[in-house]
């Protein structure tokens, strides 16, 4: 009732509202709007009030996700006047999405220096063409799987089917109506899959089963590097990559073991069968059979006081890994991209030494640090 009596022009009230908006509302509720005028094709200035209030939350690279679901990594710089500017990669985003003069772009912050972008024409109507930009990131993986899989057309088609199922779901609030025949083709398999999830949940795991997996343990940093064989060699890390990753200043607690994992495009799909494989050595040493079937994940660098995601950890005869809705939410909320490198730091209780499998937290807790290759080098995404 008190709020209703406050005058519309009360400066104290406005300051209080500003404070609540920027300091207490969820970040994914925050937006900014900008018009494409002047020389907009080479760079774009982020509104200063938005940039100032997000100081420290926007890294040297941001991810822009168009309505099609495709994501661009854009380099960030500061102008001579201190303005935050999107530069490297911005022109490619503009060209691919057909952004023209006097168009209006609405940016919604989606976490981890990431934005969902809607594009409107000068009349104020959303443009249709950005919804249909080819997602070459997923296409590259499908082509690789088909080329190196050797007679796995069924797998390839299945992967493509999951992609078709994902796209309308994620953009359902903006898509036009789909003809009934198309709906049957897109969603009929998903209905049938609901009844056989437990039977086939391992069919779409990534390719780090025992026979295709190698683990390199860095004795000093206790990094466990996974190598993916077979059809997913594009996600392998070279020796130079591993050395560079080991040099990145990641806030890992001394003595905590770290699983280093490259994220596949398939890990980011809405398929309920996708599993992020964990190496047998790491799982056997630190996530043994006596451990709970749930892992708590937190973003690294937060000191354990931030958001948490409860992720299912599954074990099967020849594989083990993170699986299910909890993992998909973690990947979505943190803006993970294919080829990101996740460092899963298992937090041990104080005083637990190397190989001490009894002195873990009651429920396994992992701080996840994310590295991304930007202009040829790995950087820590905060």
From Swiss-Prot:
It comes from the Eukaryota. Residues 136-158, 193-202 have a biased composition (Basic and acidic residues). Keywords: DNA-binding, Nucleus, Repeat, Transcription, Transcription regulation. Coiled coil: none annotated. This is B3 domain-containing protein Os03g0622100. CDD domains: B3_DNA. Pfam families: B3. Residues 136-222 are annotated as: Disordered. GO terms for molecular function: DNA binding. Residues 203-218 have a biased composition (Acidic residues).
């Amino acid at each position: 009732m008190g709020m209703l009596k406050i005058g519309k022009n009360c400066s104290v009230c406005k300051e209080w509202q500003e404070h609540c908006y920027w300091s207490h509302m969820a970040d994914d509720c925050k937006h900014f709007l900008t018009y494409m005028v002047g020389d907009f094709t080479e760079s774009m200035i982020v509104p200063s009030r938005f940039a100032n209030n997000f100081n420290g939350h926007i890294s040297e690279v941001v991810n822009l996700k168009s309505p099609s679901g495709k994501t661009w990594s854009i380099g960030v710089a500061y102008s001579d006047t201190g303005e935050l500017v999107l530069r490297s990669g911005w022109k490619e985003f503009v060209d691919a999405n057909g952004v023209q003069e006097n168009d209006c772009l609405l940016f919604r912050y989606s976490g981890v220096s990431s934005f969902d972008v809607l594009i409107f024409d000068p009349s104020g109507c959303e443009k249709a063409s950005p919804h249909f930009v080819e997602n070459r990131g997923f296409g590259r993986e499908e082509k690789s799987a088909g080329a190196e899989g050797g007679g796995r057309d069924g797998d390839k088609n299945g992967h493509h089917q999951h992609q078709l199922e994902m796209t309308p779901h994620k953009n359902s609030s903006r898509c036009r109506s789909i003809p009934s025949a198309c709906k049957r083709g897109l969603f009929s398999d998903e209905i049938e899959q609901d009844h056989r999830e437990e039977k086939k949940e391992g069919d779409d795991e990534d390719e780090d089963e025992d026979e295709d997996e190698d683990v390199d343990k860095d004795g000093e940093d206790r990094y466990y590097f996974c190598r993916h064989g077979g059809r997913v060699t594009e996600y392998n890390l070279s020796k130079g990559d591993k050395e560079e990753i080991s040099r990145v200043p990641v806030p890992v607690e001394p003595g905590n073991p770290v699983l280093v994992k490259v994220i596949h495009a398939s890990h980011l799909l809405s398929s309920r069968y996708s599993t992020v494989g964990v190496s047998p050595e790491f799982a056997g040493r630190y996530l043994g059979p006596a451990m709970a079937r749930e892992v708590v994940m937190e973003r690294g660098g937060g000191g354990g006081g931030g958001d948490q995601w409860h992720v299912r950890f599954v074990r099967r005869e020849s594989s083990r890994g993170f699986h299910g809705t909890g993992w998909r939410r973690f990947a979505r909320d943190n803006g993970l991209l294919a080829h990101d490198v996740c460092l899963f730091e298992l937090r041990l209780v104080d005083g637990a030494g190397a190989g001490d499998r009894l002195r873990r937290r009651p429920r396994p807790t992992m701080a996840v640090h994310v590295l991304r290759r930007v202009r040829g080098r790995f950087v820590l995404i905060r």
